[in-house]
């Protein structure tokens, strides 16, 4: 088995059973194409989401190092920060979150509702900054201050996206391959590509398990030129950890994130409304709505490699719907 080295890494069991992989009949009829969805928005902690897969590995490493505090960073409405805070609460750890306001809004819902509200419920220590211009350095500086206060901090990068965290999505590729075996031959897989760990982990796993399936990352914050090296660097780092080769081409579409990260656009919001009305499934305006807009447009523009079944990776994010009201 090509991914046997995964078992060498300590991992906490937060998720348990595989998340559902479902056919979307009404959405498929609407688009004239077989569409399946991997429902990582229903992972069983803090309103779900993809970051829990990464945190299974990262939190295990934190405990191995004897940490009593998890430190991470993100936007005020970060799904990753929300899930990190929930994991810290579950494990009896302190959590410190370095937050920015990337869209510069003064809207009360954005500043206090959605993920930000949940951070308070998880008793998170909030540190605000003007901007996460160099998040790795800023997190290390914060960790130094926290350590000086007598804590034992463990730094988790933005999005949980380092080689260790991204192993969670190599593991997810295993899950997907097992669920598809004998049931459906997926032609294309679509995922939101942001901090790059989910995309890179899937790239490594699917290359070895479902090599005939193309993986397309729809960017949510950067151009292809800026995003490609982030994904490739992580892809290679993951492969090195697992003692594998990783030669699959990284495919990115950057036509759907304008006007910028965290700012809803019409195509993304239409995708959110469409899936809600047709399937009762909630996307979000920052990540999955824009990724689904890419899938929808990709079908109409014939951007996929063929007309076979498409799998959409639902990474979560529904709490942001409340933060972005009345835009949704």
From Swiss-Prot:
The keyword Glycosyltransferase does not apply. Keywords: Lyase, Pyridoxal phosphate. One of its GO terms (molecular function) is D-cysteine desulfhydrase activity. The modification N6-(pyridoxal phosphate)lysine is found at residue 51. Its EC number is 4.4.1.15. It catalyses: D-cysteine + H2O = hydrogen sulfide + pyruvate + NH4(+) + H(+). It is an enzyme of class 4 (lyase). One of its GO terms (biological process) is D-amino acid metabolic process. It comes from the Bacteria. CDD domains: ACCD. Its cofactor is pyridoxal 5'-phosphate. The keyword Protein transport does not apply. SUPFAM superfamilies: Tryptophan synthase beta subunit-like PLP-dependent enzymes. Disulfide bonds: none annotated. Catalyzes the alpha,beta-elimination reaction of D-cysteine and of several D-cysteine derivatives. It could be a defense mechanism against D-cysteine. Homodimer. Belongs to the ACC deaminase/D-cysteine desulfhydrase family. This is D-cysteine desulfhydrase. It comes from Shigella flexneri.
């Amino acid at each position: 088995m090509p991914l046997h080295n995964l078992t060498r890494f300590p991992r906490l069991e937060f998720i348990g059973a595989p998340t559902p992989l479902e056919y979307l009949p009404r959405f498929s009829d609407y688009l004239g194409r077989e569409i399946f969805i991997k429902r990582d928005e229903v992972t069983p902690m803090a309103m779900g989401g993809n970051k829990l897969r990464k945190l299974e590995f990262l939190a295990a490493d934190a405990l191995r190092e004897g940490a009593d505090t998890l430190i991470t960073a993100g936007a005020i409405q970060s799904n990753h920060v929300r899930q990190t805070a929930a994991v810290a609460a579950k494990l009896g750890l302190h959590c410190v979150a370095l937050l920015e306001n990337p869209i510069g809004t003064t809207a009360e819902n954005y500043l206090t509702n959605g993920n930000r509200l949940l951070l308070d419920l998880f008793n998170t220590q909030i540190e605000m900054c003007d901007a996460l211009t160099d998040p790795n350095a800023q997190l290390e500086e914060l960790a130094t201050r926290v350590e000086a206060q007598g804590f034992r901090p463990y730094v988790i990068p933005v999005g949980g996206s380092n080689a260790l965290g991204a192993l969670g999505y190599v593991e997810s590729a295993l899950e997907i391959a097992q669920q598809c075996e004998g049931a459906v031959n997926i032609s294309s897989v679509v995922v939101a590509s942001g901090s790059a760990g989910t995309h890179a982990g899937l790239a490594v796993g699917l290359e070895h398990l479902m090599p005939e399936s193309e993986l397309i990352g729809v960017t949510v914050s950067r151009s292809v030129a800026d995003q490609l090296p982030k994904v490739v660097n992580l892809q290679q780092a993951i492969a090195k950890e697992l003692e594998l080769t990783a030669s699959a081409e990284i495919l990115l579409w950057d036509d759907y994130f304008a006007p910028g990260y965290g700012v809803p656009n019409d195509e993304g919001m239409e995708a959110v409304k469409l899936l809600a009305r047709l399937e009762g499934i909630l996307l979000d305006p920052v990540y999955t709505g824009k990724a689904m807009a890419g899938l929808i447009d990709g079908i109409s523009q014939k951007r996929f490699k063929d007309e076979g079944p498409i799998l959409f990776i639902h990474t979560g994010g529904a709490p942001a719907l409340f933060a972005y009201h009345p835009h949704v």
